[in-house]
Amino acid sequence: MASVALLRSFRRREVQMASVSAFKSVSANGKNSMFGKLGYLARPFCSRPVGNDVIGIDLGTTNSCVSVMEGKTARVIENAEGSRTTPSVVAMNQKGELLVGTPAKRQAVTNPTNTIFGSKRLIGRRFDDPQTQKEMKMVPYKIVKAPNGDAWVEANGQKFSPSQIGANVLTKMKETAEAYLGKSINKAVVTVPAYFNDAQRQATKDAGKIAGLDVQRIINEPTAAALSYGMNNKEGVIAVFDLGGGTFDVSILEISSGVFEVKATNGDTFLGGEDFDNTLLEYLVNEFKRSDNIDLTKDNLALQRLREAAEKAKIELSSTTQTEINLPFITADASGAKHLNITLTRSKFEGLVGKLIERTRSPCQNCLKDAGVTIKEVDEVLLVGGMTRVPKVQEIVSEIFGKSPCKGVNPDEAVAMGAAIQGGILRGDVKDLLLLDVVPLSLGIETLGAVFTKLIPRNTTIPTKKSQVFSTAADNQMQVGIKVLQGEREMAADNKVLGEFDLVGIPPAPRGMPQIEVTFDIDANGITTVSAKDKATGKEQNITIRSSGGLSDDEINRMVKEAELNAQKDQEKKQLIDLRNSADTTIYSVEKSLSEYREKIPAEIASEIETAVSDLRTAMAGEDVEDIKAKVEAANKAVSKIGEHMSKGSGSSGSDGSSGEGTSGTEQTPEAEFEEASGSRK
């Protein structure tokens, strides 16, 4: 964007230097003026060569970030707005236009019900999940039940899966990288919270597919941060404390001779900055209700303003001990307008969110226990995620691990950089590094008595494959149902159901006689395939775990087509914007020339130019590309008559057609300031 702005500033300066030769150029070849040279606008604006770069994307709950390897270093790429992180916000405005990132976040106050944020917390979740029900009470937009039972969102009357919302953000990250690299990108490494279950990982991969990305690897966020930290030959046992916008993860890793081995991981997929914001929001609502006896929860507009103020106050209190929350005209009643003005101290804030911060303690202790590592054996503690900037969080981390945390990595960027490094490893650009990750939760099946039988314990290094033989529970049983579960509870009903399938055609036999071999195969992305095989007949059935309830292949393909259609609409929109900008430049230069030479040209020429400019302005207000092109050309032809008139030596002819003092044949023709819309000068 900066380069575009710079280019436009140069074009404006050229307007002031254009000479009468520009008029001669137009009049000599009218057909090739303006749109003969702007034919590129009729083509898609992105016709870049396809590159084989693998970008790294941190798809965050609150913000997202994209990085790419430059040589041996990962570089974070700035977006079109010049920021290194992009809000994970998607909105549908009243015109039905899709907004992503900063533009979407800016309009949230006036369009709260159609602005989707924090959708990562819904990805791969069922509508009847208790966490989904909790989230429904905290957000202004609608969370609805999809036909397959998943939690979806609604904006402008349209229903979207969380994978689609994530895909819009991934597309924004993809376009950011393409603009920087100057070539098309279709490969990426995408990060997820370490404690994401299989369904959530699959849903994230689906989001990548919808965005037109071949997701080469799904990598855990703490592991990615450790890669970023350990690139410079650092070794030892490290703990990664990752408290982001929506999720909390902690991982213990050992780095030795370029091998990054995850010992254990733990976390909470519903603990993050959003919860801190909601707690503070609830406090502010209650304070205003106490002082003014008005419940702001019934006013979506006021609530969104308050939500943004709460987030801003939270950020400010990381660097100051007190902040003012001042929102004039927050609402009104019969007595008039009401203003909110509350002073919030850091100690009060810490008191409000104390229980949330304490919730990070238990996962850390469990992770240390699972890894078989003592506090003294941890060499370094890395802080990742924006919430780790909160002083109280840093204080708790010091208490848990018995040492001050390292602040050597950027908490907002380390994850994306680590993902880019993993992309470099997959491409072969980064050598002598090996990443050994783990499965965060135990996997198994339901067996007789509704018991959860684990085949793969949590923190098993992946990729991995394990088989176990089971049998029938009844005589002459000809089919068995395989219910795939993930979790740590003993009873099947208390764990997450990932999928179900049947193995049929088992020969009749007494109970306990048939041998059914169940195999779990987990790939490097942490995505599971389960198969069941009757060893007697060789019959086999398998299932690759989809997101809970799942997007079918047909649904994913439909969403891919919708995304492509949106991309086409975006191209057409950009074409129209570029065209309007060029037309605006033409109007500027034409009016400037007319202003300077009005007294030296006949009235009919001046009138023709004014009419052409007026027609062009009218066309610009519409969306007909061809009409704008035609009106620009008409304006160019009209203004070219100034040059024709001046070149005939009429000199200072007035608007009434009479001559003034005249000019000698040897006198230099005055310069007229005009520029072709293509920006070239002859």
UniProtKB/Swiss-Prot annotation:
Region of interest (Disordered), residue spans: 640-682
GO cellular component: cytosol; mitochondrion; plant-type cell wall; plant-type vacuole; plasma membrane
Gly residues: compositionally biased ranges: 651-663
Keyword terms, alphabetized: ATP-binding, Chaperone, Cytoplasm, Mitochondrion, Nucleotide-binding, Stress response, Transit peptide
Gene3D superfamilies: 1.20.1270.10, 3.30.420.40, Actin, Chain A, domain 4 (3.90.640.10), Substrate Binding Domain Of DNAk, Chain A, domain 1 (2.60.34.10)
Listed SUPFAM superfamilies: Actin-like ATPase domain, Heat shock protein 70kD (HSP70), peptide-binding domain
Signal peptide: none
Cell compartments where the protein resides: Mitochondrion; Cytoplasm, Cytosol
UniProt-listed CDD domains: ASKHA_NBD_HSP70_HSPA9
KW Transmembrane helix (keyword) present: no
Subunit structure: Interacts with HSCB.
Family that this chain belongs to: Belongs to the heat shock protein 70 (TC 1.A.33) family. DnaK subfamily.
Cited function: Chaperone involved in the maturation of iron-sulfur [Fe-S] cluster-containing proteins. Has a low intrinsic ATPase activity which is markedly stimulated by HSCB and ISU1. In cooperation with other chaperones, Hsp70s are key components that facilitate folding of de novo synthesized proteins, assist translocation of precursor proteins into organelles, and are responsible for degradation of damaged protein under stress conditions.
HAMAP family listed in its UniProt record: DnaK (MF_00332)
Protein name: Heat shock 70 kDa protein 9, mitochondrial
Lineage, highest ranks first: Eukaryota, Viridiplantae, Streptophyta, Embryophyta, Tracheophyta
Gene it is expressed from: HSP70-9
